Design a protein with these regions (language model features):
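Beta1/beta-strand and adjacent pyrophosphate-binding region of the FAD-binding site
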Residues: 1-12
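Short N-terminal binding/cap micro-motifs at the start of the first secondary-structure element
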Residues: 12-16, 38-41
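Glycine-rich active-site loop/strand segments that organize a redox cofactor
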Residues: 49-98
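A conserved short coil-to-beta-strand element within the FAD-binding core of flavoproteins
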Residues: 131-141
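Conserved small/polar residues in nucleotide/adenosyl-binding loops
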Residues: 143-145
Length: 145
């Protein structure tokens, strides 16, 4: 059986673990978080409302709203951009709204809406979660396909 380990219990770690579990249902997906708190930055982002994405559907323009790593994000946004993010949350019952400046938040204006969605989806697809599980090294192992 294939085992996949995702390091980090933030938004990217959760989304990565969920996606791995969806596309590899036979695999065991384990998410490791060093601290005891999952999704802590999600809880405080956007003043506790959680700025999920930006209301912009052109990858090269969307990447400009991310000053750190915008250049590297262009290709990622071509694959999974704002519309895909909106759709992903909508499919899980979370509606987003755009503010005048383009920032998008859950209609509840509460980051717990996003936190709960990610936690519930991880549980639904079978992601195993361990907190207090820091990683201090990764060792390569041999394998054959």
């Amino acid at each position: 059986m294939q085992r996949i380990v995702v390091i980090g219990g933030g938004a990217a770690g959760f989304f990565g673990a969920i996606t791995c579990a969806q596309y590899n249902p036979e695999a065991t997906v384990l998410l490791l978080e060093k601290s005891g708190k999952l999704l802590s930055k999600v809880r405080v982002s956007g003043g506790g409302r959680c700025n999920v994405t930006h209301h912009c559907f052109v990858p090269s323009v969307l990447s400009q709203h991310y000053p750190r790593g915008g250049k590297q994000l262009k290709e990622a946004f071509r694959t999974f951009g704002a519309q895909e993010t909106i759709d992903w949350f909508a499919q899980r019952g979370v509606q987003l709204k755009a503010e005048a400046d383009g920032r998008m938040f859950p209609v509840t204006d509460n980051s717990e809406t996003i936190v709960n969605c990610l936690l519930q989806e991880a549980k639904r697809v079978g992601v195993q979660i361990r907190t207090g599980a820091g990683v201090d090294r990764i060792t390569a192992v041999s394998y054959t396909l």
